[in-house]
């Protein structure tokens, strides 16, 4: 690591001191570029600054690992993608860490080799243990939480859906924070023709802890990736056959992140995936090769989420709810 950029340079210097990385500290991206101390950069700034910082860096010749999303809006994503296609087509790798998760990669391998037959439904859940923090700026629970789930399903299937809709609720944690967000619980549906359904469930209300689970349903069985555990030091992937089968078709255990006290809860689940993602980025930069993900992957995920948002309904919006 050659440099750390943060407007709070004191905080950046404390990080450099704790980590022992010896990086230089800069107070702005402009200062970093002027110093000419590196040629590859990871951007983890607020969404509103993603495009601005990415543009500055790629123009300066940097290759960039950009945390999702591209810009936060469908129109902005389309415009930025068109610009990158014209001027810097291989400069940006979008940070979809689930593609580098060993458990999900194994599940994808099982699916592609026909272990559970033809897959007709994929369910992906992401549940936070609490609300977004006070002062956090959210564009909505679907854009904020579901983008990784959506990309996971697109990556697993290699397809784009043709229809989407969503349902949202405000049932608990929205009252515990000053963060203004449309819903604290939502379900996004996406249809791939008439033969495949994707379901994404996101919530801020899983008070017992961080929950990440995916299930692939096939004509000959199902694959389960992960189960909730308050101490997620292992991720189990299991493939089951049809009813009546006595043994699992496949089973493999992968290490969790072991983030420890004070670490964000998602590090416990995806710590190894984040590490591998960064390794792949650096390998591609060193070799001058193409990245495994691009800005176009970010646009595709945003297109699905935007379609769901356009059809997003809550009870107050007149969603069809039958009285009992």
Regions found by a protein language model. Name each.
Residues 1-18:
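NAD(P)-binding Rossmann-fold cofactor-contacting core
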Residues 19-83, 273:
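Beta-loop-alpha module in the N-terminal Rossmann-like domain of NAD(P)-dependent dehydrogenases
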Residues 40-43, 78, 266-267, 280-324:
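C-terminal helix-rich "cap/oligomerization" subdomain common to oxidoreductases
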Residues 48, 71-134:
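A contiguous active-site-proximal alpha/beta segment in oxidoreductase catalytic domains
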Residues 133-209, 296:
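Rossmann-like dinucleotide-binding domain that binds NAD(P)(H)
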Residues 178-181, 194-276, 294:
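NAD(P)-dinucleotide binding in Rossmann-like oxidoreductases
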């Amino acid at each position: 690591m050659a440099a750390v950029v943060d407007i709070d340079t004191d905080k950046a210097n404390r990080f450099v001191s704790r980590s022992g990385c010896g990086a230089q500290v800069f107070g702005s991206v402009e200062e970093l570029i002027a110093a000419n101390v590196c040629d590859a950069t990871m951007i983890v700034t607020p969404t509103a600054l993603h495009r601005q910082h990415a543009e500055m860096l790629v123009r300066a010749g940097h290759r960039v690992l950009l945390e999702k999303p591209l810009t936060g809006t469908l129109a902005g994503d389309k415009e930025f993608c068109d610009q990158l296609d014209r001027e810097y087509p291989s400069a940006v790798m979008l940070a979809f860490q689930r593609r580098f998760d060993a458990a999900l990669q194994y599940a994808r391998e099982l699916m592609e080799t026909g272990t559970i037959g033809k897959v007709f439904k994929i369910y992906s859940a992401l549940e936070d243990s609490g609300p977004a923090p006070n002062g956090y700026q959210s564009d909505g629970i679907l854009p904020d939480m579901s983008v990784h789930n959506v990309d996971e399903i697109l990556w697993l299937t290699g397809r784009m859906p043709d229809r989407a809709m969503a349902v949202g609720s405000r049932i608990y944690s929205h009252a515990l924070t000053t963060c203004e967000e449309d819903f604290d619980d939502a379900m996004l549906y996406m249809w791939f023709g008439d033969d495949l359904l994707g379901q994404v469930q996101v919530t801020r209300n899983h008070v017992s802890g961080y929950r990440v689970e995916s299930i692939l349903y096939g004509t000959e069985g199902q694959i389960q990736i992960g189960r909730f555990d308050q101490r997620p030091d292992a991720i189990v992937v299991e493939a089951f056959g049809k009813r009546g089968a006595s043994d699992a078709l496949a089973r493999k255990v992968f290490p969790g992140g072991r983030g420890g006290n004070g670490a964000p809860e998602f590090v416990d689940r995806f710590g190894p995936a984040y590490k591998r993602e960064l390794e792949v980025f650096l390998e591609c930069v060193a070799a001058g090769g193409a990245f495994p993900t691009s800005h176009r992957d970010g646009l595709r995920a945003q297109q699905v989420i935007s379609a769901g948002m356009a059809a997003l309904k809550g009870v107050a919006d007149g969603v069809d709810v039958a009285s009992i």
